[in-house]
């Protein structure tokens, strides 16, 4: 079954034959579209007036709507007009002259007829788009950090520099990337300073151990002999 809310329908031949689209003939134009219900009250009135030329001339849009109010069942009515390029048509179920239940809404815009999407369809589309962008963001965030037992989670300096050089990156993101880059370099500098501080201590320990007689050397470190 065709999904009508994805259909765009138009008939330039019909409009040319009827010398344009107006409020008094837009429902007749709509009746040619696949959105029209052939068992609606509109069709019943059209069949009744089709061969009655005198009644057809008197049946203006206002009189047509008044006749629909006397009936019960499915009907199409014009709810908004902005000539010459916009009409809103509502499909509804009439229960009595004062009470109706809306079913769907249609737009006639510049000779094109559309069906308005439902609220559920709009929400589904928005949630799907949001989920897709969240998935992309999480995939990119997972690839940013790297882990090592000695340093924990770190960010590659090349990744930070590349991201910071992108002109399309927002200022807030650039500031965060700059902070991460400075923290990363500070951590590296701290580790290098720690290694340089303990290097003389290690050298002194090795010199002291080498001065003790009978102490063998194993890979640059002095191990005392067991007695």
Swiss-Prot record:
Molecular function via GO: transcription coactivator activity
UniProtKB keywords: Activator, Nucleus, Transcription, Transcription regulation
GO cellular component entries: core mediator complex; mediator complex
Domain of life: Eukaryota
Annotated Polar residues bias: 149-162
Keyword Transcription annotated: yes
Record-level GO BP terms: regulation of transcription by RNA polymerase II
Pfam families found in the cross-reference section: Med6
Subcellular location: Nucleus
Residue ranges, annotated region (Disordered): 149-172, 204-227
Major site of localization recorded for this protein: nucleus
Subunit field text: Component of the Mediator complex.
Family to which the UniProt record says this protein belongs: Belongs to the Mediator complex subunit 6 family.
Task performed by this protein: Component of the Mediator complex, a coactivator involved in the regulated transcription of nearly all RNA polymerase II-dependent genes. Mediator functions as a bridge to convey information from gene-specific regulatory proteins to the basal RNA polymerase II transcription machinery. Mediator is recruited to promoters by direct interactions with regulatory proteins and serves as a scaffold for the assembly of a functional preinitiation complex with RNA polymerase II and the general transcription factors.
Protein's UniProt name: Mediator of RNA polymerase II transcription subunit 6
